[in-house]
Amino acid sequence: MIERFMNRIAGARLPALAVAAVAALLGGCAGRDTGANEPWDPIEGANRFVFSINRAVDIIAIRPIAVLYRDWMPPPAQRGLHNVLENLGEPVTAIAEVVQGTPGRAGTTLARFLVNSTIGIAGLFDVASAIGLPKTKEGFGNTIGYYAGVEPENGGFYIVLPMIGPSNARDGVGMAIDASIDPFSIVTFSISSTAGWVYAGARFGATVVDTRSRTLYALDDLERNSVDYYAALRSAYTQQRAEIIRQKRDRTGPRAELERRDKLALVR
């Protein structure tokens, strides 16, 4: 049941230093035996309290709005909004890819951003995918996990964030870095604090509605089949994030680099 939920669901010195610092911090937690894919939840009482508030807000406001949006907004408009939100995230993805040491992917991401922002009319249409520029989605939560010398499951302590939901130390710091280097946030806040907060609020609200509308069935199914919805969501989040980090490290991380070197040695 949790697996079904999981399935549905150069100039970067400062970010690199932050990644290294958090990776070292998480490395210090590596000795804690929490079991494979077992979340470390030392503040469970506080997390459950925040979860209950988030749950109430979801029942009263977010879910009903998401249902109306899904049922009444024309599908092309829904796709357009989703595309715009994805396009706004491309610059941060490109920066994260540079820090991860994959400049080729970063170049593709920037090309996607330029194509979709112009020909795609501010990102409404994903023209880039149609012409063979594949999408990747990165952030500094992934980047910290990529470099951290610990098992992918060890993202630090589990935390439930107000209005955001499941997270952990690694991903929480990653989100903070993402927000601090986002070019659109920097530009709008440089205009005025009012402009910055209006932009941030509008983008956050649109993201919440878009994401919630896309997870209605998955979350309903998870809750319906769970004895403890909090624990089920915590487990699903931890397993999903661990798998994402594991795949990243296996495909492009240190282990993959060693395998490439071994293959070259055999060829020679």
Q: In which residue ranges do the predicted regions lie?
A:
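Bacterial signal peptide processing site
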Residues: 30-33
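A structured, mid-to-C-terminal "fold-capping" secondary-structure block
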Residues: 37, 142, 146, 150-268
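Mid-length scaffold segments of soluble, non-membrane domains
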Residues: 87-169
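Surface-exposed, polar/charged faces of alpha-helical domains
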Residues: 74-79, 86, 97-105, 130, ...
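N-terminal post-signal-peptidase region of extra-cytosolic proteins
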Residues: 50, 66-81, 100-101, 108, ...
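Post-signal peptide N-terminal segment of mature Sec-exported envelope proteins
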Residues: 35-61, 67-68, 86
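Bacterial N-terminal signal peptides that target proteins for export
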Residues: 2-18
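C-terminal motif of bacterial Sec signal peptides marking the signal peptidase cleavage site
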Residues: 25-28
